[in-house]
Curated annotation (Swiss-Prot):
Pfam families: DUF188. This is UPF0178 protein IL2341. It comes from Idiomarina loihiensis (strain ATCC BAA-735 / DSM 15497 / L2-TR). Belongs to the UPF0178 family. InterPro entries: UPF0178. PANTHER family: UPF0178 PROTEIN YAII (PTHR35146:SF1).
């Protein structure tokens, strides 16, 4: 299993959990972003800087990932694409995207986009909480235990 982070929008606290997990389990972890992100020195942790532009990092993750890899992202369309390739997708809040729930999540996302386009302000997600961090770490541990 290889780990990929959609790193431009991934909270620092979640990246740090992933750094520790990659070291502990000796799994390769790729941070894919259009800006340089500081990483610890490790033969398991790699920074992949892509050009700027819409979905450039997402396309790179889809290109690189394989079945049974784990992608950390809150980007629903990216999660859908990697699931179609047989990979797993986990949000920074600990929600596992699956073939069974991804279509519903895409529909909700599209509905919210339509509402925003019509001028209705929906606000963004709340800040990452300690409960979110724990949910993420617990779910990550369960996924890595099966690798």
């Amino acid at each position: 299993m290889t780990l990929f982070i959609d790193a431009d929008a991934c909270p620092v606290a979640i990246r740090e959990i992933l750094f520790r997990a990659a070291q502990r389990k000796q799994l390769h972890l790729y941070l894919v972003a259009n800006q340089r992100i500081q990483t610890p020195k490790s033969k398991f942790i790699h920074m992949v800087q892509v050009g700027s532009g819409f979905d450039v990092a997402d396309h790179e993750i889809v290109r690189r990932c394989e079945a049974d890899d784990l992608i950390i992202t809150s980007d629903i369309p990216l999660a859908s694409e990697v699931i179609d390739k047989g990979a797993k997708a986990l949000s920074p809040r600990g929600e596992l995207f699956t073939p069974d729930n991804i279509r519903q999540r895409l529909n909700i996302r599209d509905f919210m986009d339509t509402m925003r386009s019509s001028g209705i302000q929906s606000g963004g997600p709340p800040p990452l909480s300690n409960v979110d961090r724990k949910n993420f770490a617990d779910h990550l541990d369960r996924l890595l235990a099966g690798s």
